[in-house]
């Protein structure tokens, strides 16, 4: 029988068994999951992109709604 896959919790680093039994995976607990969500909401985490990529997204190609 194979060993269950274990990953580190992204928030606290605790070992976490990656299985359907763990409702919080990849986190070890609801607390760590909420800490991570709060960091995203506070913009402490960001998805990498080039400078000005947000400006390109809103470049004025679309007519404004009135």
UniProtKB/Swiss-Prot annotation:
GO terms for biological process: regulation of DNA-templated transcription. The keyword GTP-binding does not apply. InterPro entries: DNA_gyrase_inhibitor_YacG, Znf_NHR/GATA. Its cofactor is Zn(2+). It comes from the Bacteria. GO terms for molecular function: DNA topoisomerase type II (double strand cut, ATP-hydrolyzing) inhibitor activity; zinc ion binding. The keyword Transit peptide does not apply. Inhibits all the catalytic activities of DNA gyrase by preventing its interaction with DNA. Acts by binding directly to the C-terminal domain of GyrB, which probably disrupts DNA binding by the gyrase. This is DNA gyrase inhibitor YacG. The gene is yacG.
């Amino acid at each position: 029988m194979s060993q269950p896959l274990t990953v580190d919790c992204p928030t606290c680093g605790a070992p976490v068994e990656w299985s359907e039994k763990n409702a919080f995976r990849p986190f070890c607990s609801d607390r760590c999951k909420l800490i991570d969500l709060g960091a995203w909401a506070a913009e402490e985490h960001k998805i990498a992109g080039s400078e000005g990529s947000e400006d390109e997204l809103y470049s004025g190609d679309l007519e404004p709604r009135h």
